[in-house]
Curated annotation (Swiss-Prot):
Superkingdom, taxonomy of origin: Bacteria
UniProt subunit comment: NDH-1 is composed of 14 different subunits. Subunits NuoB, C, D, E, F, and G constitute the peripheral sector of the complex.
NCBIfam families tied to this protein: nuoB_fam, PRK06411.1
Protein's organism: Citrifermentans bemidjiense (strain ATCC BAA-1014 / DSM 16622 / JCM 12645 / Bem)
Protein's name according to its UniProt entry: NADH-quinone oxidoreductase subunit B
Length: 170
């Protein structure tokens, strides 16, 4: 049994987009940015009862290791430059989740010091409403983010086949 023997039925063919999107959606590493009471619900979501690890979601403490940021709570204008800096430190591709009424729309705080929705500063991919949203809502929002990632179009070209011989470039 050598490498040259035909593989028969054991060949997998897929597009590179599908393969990369499957890997990205199956390993979301969010950075937590808890600013208010929503952070408590985010911690509860990461606990054993909801077990985000089974979906490949592992919280990271460093923006350089994260590909998603969860903005949970009230964003003040004084905190906004810090959030932008953290977002810029994240590698591409990156996604933003707005968790809670305050992060989505400013909540009940209609004052000069509160940002009326984080989407004024960052491109938000998923909004999770509630004050504060329950852990089930955050889990649902992260699953919706996985669906969005699975359907993204990348800049990769054709399909690849595992088991195909690739000729060296001349």
């Amino acid at each position: 049994m050598g490498v040259d023997q035909p593989l028969g039925e054991n060949i997998i063919t897929t597009s590179l987009d599908s393969l990369v999107n499957w890997a990205r959606k199956s390993s979301i590493w969010p950075m937590t940015f808890g600013l208010a009471c929503c952070a408590i619900e985010m911690m509860a979501t990461g606990a054993a009862k909801h077990d985000l690890d089974r979906f490949g979601i592992i919280f990271r403490a460093s923006p350089r290791q994260a590909d998603c940021i969860i903005i949970a709570g009230t964003v003040t204008k004084k905190m906004l430059p810090v959030i932008k800096t953290v977002y810029e430190q994240m590698p591409e591709p990156k996604w933003v989740v707005a968790m809670g009424a305050c992060a989505c729309s400013g909540g009940v705080f209609d004052t000069y010091s509160v940002v009326q929705g984080i989407d004024e500063a960052l491109p938000v991919d998923v909004y999770i409403p509630g004050c504060p949203p329950r852990p089930e809502a955050l889990l649902y929002g992260l699953l919706k983010l996985q669906d969005k990632i699975a359907n993204e179009r990348n800049s990769f070209g054709s399909s690849i086949g595992l088991g195909e011989r690739l000729e060296p470039a001349a």
